[in-house]
Amino acid sequence: MARKDQISHRGPLSGNNRSHALNATKRKFNLNLQQITLKTASGKKIRLKVSAKTKKTLRKWGHV
């Protein structure tokens, strides 16, 4: 499975590492993916990989 949030569909970002001499080398900023379990309206459990930011938003709105 790709490193994507299954709810918000956000993926990794790209940027640069910067050394002390300010040399730039490409790097990837991965999401902080975590596995959560949600209950559907019918009571069925589903497991999703979501970012920590999405998990925090779901918790705020009472879905987790």
Swiss-Prot record:
Domain of life (superkingdom): Bacteria
Any one GO molecular function term: structural constituent of ribosome
Keyword Ribosomal protein among UniProt keywords: yes
GO terms for biological process, alphabetical: translation
Keywords: Ribonucleoprotein, Ribosomal protein
Residue ranges of the region described as Disordered: 1-23
Keyword Ribonucleoprotein in record: yes
UniProt record similarity statement: Belongs to the bacterial ribosomal protein bL28 family.
Name of the protein: Large ribosomal subunit protein bL28
Species annotation: Mesomycoplasma hyopneumoniae (strain J / ATCC 25934 / NCTC 10110)
